[in-house]
């Protein structure tokens, strides 16, 4: 298991389209992927779980991955949320 704290820099946070793209990217990996905010941990492959966190720009979250491709999943997803687009 690997984990990393990251600051979400997406202009709209993880809302609507960015959240859908994040979930789509997370589903490309075989590892289990989770996102944690303020002690609430959700499956990052679930759009409903991700939306329930209400992650806005500037929010610090913890990405957690466990499985065969955990390191690659963590790196790609961390890079995605840290993009300033």
From Swiss-Prot:
GO biological process terms held by the UniProt record: phosphoenolpyruvate-dependent sugar phosphotransferase system
CDD domains the record matches: PTS-HPr_like
Residue ranges constituting the HPr domain according to the UniProt record: 1-85
InterPro entries: HPr, HPr-like, HPr-like_sf, PTS_HPr_Ser_P_site
Keywords: Phosphoprotein
Modified residues (Phosphoserine): 46
Matches recorded under PROSITE patterns: PTS_HPR_DOM (PS51350), PTS_HPR_SER (PS00589)
Coiled-coil boundaries: none
Family indicated by similarity: Belongs to the HPr family.
Subunit structure: Mixture of monomers and homodimers. Interacts with CcpA as a monomer.
Additional remark text: Not phosphorylated by PEP and by enzyme I.
Function: Along with seryl-phosphorylated HPr, phosphorylated Crh is implicated in carbon catabolite repression (CCR) of levanase, inositol dehydrogenase, and beta-xylosidase. Exerts its effect on CCR by interacting with CcpA.
Name the UniProt record assigns to this protein: HPr-like protein Crh
């Amino acid at each position: 298991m690997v984990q990393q704290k990251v600051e979400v820099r997406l202009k709209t946070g993880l809302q609507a389209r960015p959240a859908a793209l994040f979930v789509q990217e997370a589903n490309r990996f075989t590892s289990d992927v989770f996102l944690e905010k303020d002690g609430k941990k959700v499956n990052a492959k679930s759009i409903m779980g991700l939306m329930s966190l209400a992650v806005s720009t500037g929010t610090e979250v913890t990405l957690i991955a466990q499985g065969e491709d955990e390191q690659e999943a963590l790196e790609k997803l961390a890079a995605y949320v840290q993009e300033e687009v």
